[in-house]
Amino acid sequence: MLKRLLSKCAEGETLTEAEAYEAMNAVMSGEATDSQIASLVSILRVRGETVDEIAGFVRAMRDRMTTIDAGDDVIDTCGTGGDGAATFNVSTAAAIVVSSLGVKVAKHGNRAVSSKSGSADVLERLGIDIPASPEAAKQALETKGLAFLFAPLYHAAMKYAAGPRKEIGFRTIFNLIGPLANPARCKRQVIGVYSTRYAEKLAETMRRLGSEHVVFVTGRDGLDECSIAAETDVVELKDGDIRRFVLTPESVGLRXGGLADVQVRSSEESAALLEAVMDGTAPASAIDITALNAGVALYAAGKAETIAAGVAMAKDAILVKTAYEQLQRLRRKEVVHGA
């Protein structure tokens, strides 16, 4: 079956959504060989993945993932990664700020692959538990408002793609679909995308898959999140409509900053800077990039009417130590891990 689909792709044809679903199932069942997996994703990358293909892959991934019952009022802040900018874990910092304001956050992530510090790495450095089971994650969401969903725990079938992904070394469709397959089945998200050419395809995909409000962001300085140092291209899916606009720090009440103040060399430095943001002692650029990304998340969650209002709420949460109090709450060993 996969040989037939590979041949079709090699001839320059695209896959239907159903065929893409079949292909991804072959990958996740262990039926596909490493060579077949590498060939498939390489062909798609060179030719350009279609919305049908992305949607088929995501549906297959969602059908095989372990899920948690998180309710309808949960949001995720994550990115495709691979921006190469060596910034601290901004989306993780934003998740803490957002959860301090009463919005439940199911933070989907992993360890570092190409970055200096993955979200799992920095949480461990901060002394925050990573729930060891879906049950523990659900409890963390209910008691603390934020749970980290460690991707390998929920996407065990993706282990078959690990070898080819590592050997290939370049970004493929697998980098795109991870954020679209949150185990909490979030309908509202902020997703950082490393290239604007993918943001519209991902928005179309999420519209097809039934998302309510998803904001895709790409900094023009290469960040896969809202930048404090440059304009950010935004593609917004809201209630079935897709719109595009450009976001600047100044347009939401912030001053433009410098990337140097938000860059780190290790997970230790990332954790230290994140904590400094929460207690208000970090450089202004680090505080503002956190408030900017948290503000977009508050807007996507429906907590704020506009991004500017969300940014103001987020910055206030940092300045009055609400976010720092949430960081301390997350550190407390109250969650009992499931088996």
Curated annotation (Swiss-Prot):
Binding site for anthranilate 2: R165
Coiled-coil zones: none
Residues binding Mg(2+) 2, per UniProt: D224, E225
Gene Ontology biological process terms from the UniProt entry: L-tryptophan biosynthetic process
Protein's pathway: Amino-acid biosynthesis; L-tryptophan biosynthesis; L-tryptophan from chorismate: step 2/5
Catalytic activity: N-(5-phospho-beta-D-ribosyl)anthranilate + diphosphate = 5-phospho-alpha-D-ribose 1-diphosphate + anthranilate
GO molecular function: anthranilate phosphoribosyltransferase activity; magnesium ion binding
Record: residues binding Mg(2+) 1: S91, E225
GO cellular component terms, semicolon-separated: cytosol
Residues that bind 5-phospho-alpha-D-ribose 1-diphosphate: 79, 82-83, 87, 89-92, 107-115, 119
Xref: Gene3D superfamilies: Nucleoside phosphorylase/phosphoribosyltransferase catalytic domain, Transferase, Pyrimidine Nucleoside Phosphorylase, Chain C
InterPro entries: Anthranilate_Pribosyl_Tfrase, Glycosyl_Trfase_fam3, Glycosyl_Trfase_fam3_N_dom, Glycosyl_Trfase_fam3_N_dom_sf, Nuc_phospho_transferase
Cofactor: Mg(2+)
EC number: 2.4.2.18
Cofactor binding remark: Binds 2 magnesium ions per monomer.
Keyword Magnesium: yes
Key words, A-Z: Amino-acid biosynthesis, Aromatic amino acid biosynthesis, Glycosyltransferase, Magnesium, Metal-binding, Transferase, Tryptophan biosynthesis
Keyword Transferase in annotation: yes
Subunit structure: Homodimer.
HAMAP family: TrpD
Family: Belongs to the anthranilate phosphoribosyltransferase family.
PANTHER family tied to this protein: ANTHRANILATE PHOSPHORIBOSYLTRANSFERASE
Protein name per UniProt: Anthranilate phosphoribosyltransferase
Gene: trpD
